[in-house]
Amino acid sequence: MPGSTDALEPRRPYEVFEHTADVGLHAFGRTLSELFIHAAQGMESLMVAPEQVRVQVSREITVTGHDEVSLLIAWLNELIVLFDTEYLLLRQFEIDEISGTYLKGRASGEPYDAQRHDIGSAIKAVTWHEAAVELTDEGYKVRIIFDI
């Protein structure tokens, strides 16, 4: 499988940072697939602690973009739409196919349950402000800011 969440590198897969009335994330991955998975994990962790979410349902996601940044923003915004429309909290992410302009993958989790889930930040959207995907000696790195 092109991307999985089984073996994480020693470095944390993502780091949260504060940004004037919003919140940001640096995510890291050895591959583009791993970067997108870690960015999704980081974003979802802002909404709910991952250990509170069971893997009960899965949704296939296909998005396109004109480059890696727009593709990542489309991927993350599609995950936000799943919460906004189906109240799905997500925990597990898989990338089946990815290029610089196309992604096909899956996101799995469960519907929000007020009895079990403590919601943190409500994310409205991923912003374009300062969004950048960078290839480094260690792999990929992204900086993204969320409108909360």
Q: What feature does the model see in each segment?
A:
Residues 2-148:
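N-terminal intrinsically disordered, cationic/polar leader segments
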